[in-house]
Amino acid sequence: FFGTRHNTYKFFAPYANLDGFTYAEAEVPVAERPEIDRWILSELNSLIKNVDACYADYEPTKAGRLINDFVNDNLSNWYVRLCRKRFWGTGYTQDKLAAYQTLYVCLETVAKLMAPISPFYADQLYMNLVSTTGRDNVVSVHLAKFPVCDESIIDKELESRMQMAQKVSSMGLALRKKINIIVKQPLQKLMIPVDAVTKERLEAVKSLIMNEVNIKEIDFVEGASD
């Protein structure tokens, strides 16, 4: 967990420094950000809600596991991996700014959420972030306000669609590995058994799956889906 969290920060920091990102620009409205940004912010606010409930119930271990799953499965292995080209691109476009603002908020919020169970590590990472932006005029993460869930940003349908994309992509990559076909080698078609609801959700994230698994076409086979 600590390694993944730190590696995510190490990915963010050099590009942010190179582009001079200090969070001085106006917020890009969430509604105007790409779907991948809206998804991770929805997951982040769901995390805030669930972690806050865990702490209220004196369940720090459960809170830690939730934070760990978010960082590993959603932030690092999905959001950052799918958005790398947005940070690499030339120029300082609104899309790149939205990516910086989104990832920064995720990193800062995770630092605050983990502070009660990892006080020293959380403080170091938090201060590394705010020392550049000055968004919080505090000298420690332990003096910062604890995150508050914004229910208006949570989109459970979007979270469900992206979860399906992650599951299908993982299965597709596992099949590649099983038959020793590297991801760099494009494949013609992936066939997925679906029902009507699953098909509609997967259609919305079809391009993500195709890019992640490196296939040219997805064929939805009508029938029961698991």
Where are these regions (language model features)?
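Feature 926 captures the class I aminoacyl-tRNA synthetase adenylation module centered on the KMSKS loop
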Residues: 1-226
